[in-house]
A protein has these predicted regions:
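Alpha/beta enzyme core
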Residues: 1-66, 73-230
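Structural signal for terminal/edge beta-strands and the immediately following C-terminal loop/tail
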Residues: 229-239
């Protein structure tokens, strides 16, 4: 992963506080982790834009580093995407990731994908809504499981022509990354991160989607499993 930064994901203030000493270039407030923190449900689609934005504003107070926000599939049509982008930027987002999922977006392995016309309209809406010239829109391509490599390559080609800040590739394997990174492209290619993934030529960054939270959660579950239901009183108390 040399020269390719890792963007750790968080959903809670506790996790973000632990990450503050990490030499990251930015942190990703994953919608799924935010929903897990607020509702106990690991599904980004359970949060409205206003709920997510309110949580983002609180998290913004905990760090000066860039925060990557989860724009999901725009929270509706292109008009909704426009106003959602404005709200999240004003709430402290420095980067906003827009998924090509069909609305409503949900955290799943094989999500239904929007039409190219719909996704293009939302990308333009998000780009038009940005107020700060330093704020970036990243396009998230999630169609590999349902659309295949050829369709994803065609989509990457036209998405790359837009004035976005990067393209995030999800649901990949090594062959997929080899094919996509071999394509001519002008924008940064970022892949969702998997544990123990080796450095990969052509990938400019890795986006964590919850490994840290999963590891911490497994540790907590183990502690709770081993927690005794009752504690014996000391003998001196029983006398």
């Amino acid at each position: 992963m040399e020269n390719a930064p890792l963007y750790p994901a968080f959903g809670s203030g506790q996790t973000l506080a632990l990450l503050r000493d990490h030499a990251a270039q930015g942190y990703f407030m994953a919608g799924s982790l935010a929903a897990d923190t607020l509702l106990g449900v690991r599904d980004a689609g359970m949060l409205s834009c206003s709920e997510y934005a309110a949580h983002l504003r609180r998290m913004r107070l905990l760090t000066d580093k860039p925060i990557i926000a989860d724009l999901q599939s725009g929270f509706g049509n292109p008009m909704n995407t426009y106003f959602a982008t404005q709200e999240l930027e004003r709430s402290g987002a420095n980067r906003l990731i827009l998924s090509d999922q069909r609305y409503p977006a949900h955290t799943q392995d094989c999500p239904p994908i929007a039409t190219d016309v719909d996704f293009l309209g939302k990308l333009h809406a998000a780009l038009d809504a940005v107020d700060d010239e330093n704020t970036q829109i990243w396009a998230l391509l999630e169609g590999m499981p349902t659309q295949g490599l050829e369709t994803t390559m065609a989509k990457l080609a036209w998405v790359d022509q837009l004035p976005i800040g990067g393209i995030v590739i999800a649901h990949w394997d090594r062959e997929i990354l080899m094919a996509l990174t071999a394509m001519p492209h002008q924008h940064r290619l970022i892949a969702t991160w998997q544990p123990n993934v080796p450095a990969f030529p052509g990938i400019d960054g890795w986006l964590d989607t919850g490994y840290l939270a999963d590891t911490a959660g497994n540790w907590q579950r183990q502690l709770i499993t081993n927690l005794p239901a009752e504690l014996a009183l000391p003998k001196e108390v029983l006398k």
